[in-house]
Amino acid sequence: MIIKILDPSKNATYLWLPVYFYDEPFQFQILSSIIELVFYISCFHLMTISLYVMLKVQIFHRNLYILYIPMFCVWYGLIAGKLITIAYRLKFVDLDYELGEHIAMWTDDQAKMLHVSSLRGLELLIFGGFVQWHYMYTVVYGILGVAAERAIASVLIENYETNTQLYIPIALTIITQFLAISTSLSVLFHKASVFLSHLPWIISCSLGALAYLFIKIVNENFQKQITNPRRKRLFTISQQFQVKENLRALRLGTRLVFVVFFYVAFVSFGMFALAFDLVSSAYCHFVENFLFLNPYPICFTAMLTIPHWRKHFQNACFTWRLVKSAWTKPKTSTTSVEISTTKKLEAETDLYFRQLNESWI
């Protein structure tokens, strides 16, 4: 959505928001908003349980937690921005004009822009658009920050595991957040072109792939040396643990990268198709919500990849317990019958041997 602000001196200012408004009957908008809220509440539960399990069962280095936990937490801000958009769709926020239909991610067509003389009444919508941009670029730069931290852990294997200094994750967090906020503001105020807005994705994916290969090669080489009985280098327990942690994080990262790449590809294709009217605007609901509902594949991938997390996640997740209880009811009944039969046989056996013993007396 592009907003064009034309002041009295005829100077135009543009704002670029990643929000969508549809030309649909009001009753249908209410229904679609209710359905979206149901899915968001489910995602809220899933994300909260995942964060709880990650913090309760800490199997990675503290620095890694400091980096990637905020990446999960900013999803709550993303949903807050979406709720603001829903409030404008359902006209909970009164405006003196109609917002109209805006389903293009970006456009230079003046007819498809929202023309206003001031931003009065749009402050919340602009804030909601900013937090959505911030989430996208936080994930982009955050993944690069995690890759950098694992690369540093591979280089400083001699003492990284025993290092209690927090300057590495704090410095990486400050850098990634500075880049995320500055890029979000640049895109929001339309200071960056369409190509420049996509450039961080390209750079991050390229550098992330190089960091992935570097971490993989270095740590697999260390693992071969550790398992080699004729090795010349002595590895301490903490160093061996660090190598295993790097490889475990790499395995988890590989699965998450594939999930994220699929999401980026699907959403990008959807935005392209909608921008050039290749598909009906009705599909915009699905493309848009693919971003907001990302905890489903990402959290499930993270939780079910690591056995320690999987066990606690299954015990804590309300939905998982419901499904499990539904499937285990018949088994529970059968098990109870088997236990009862076993106890009866044991009692009869004890009675037989007691009577046999008494007959010998």
From Swiss-Prot:
Main location: membrane
InterPro entries assigned: 7TM_GPCR_serpentine_rcpt_Sre
Keywords: Membrane, Transmembrane, Transmembrane helix
Membrane topology qualifier: Multi-pass membrane protein
Pfam families: Sre
Transmembrane segments: 34-54, 66-86, 124-144, 168-188, 195-215, 256-276, 286-306
Protein name, entry field: Serpentine receptor class epsilon-32
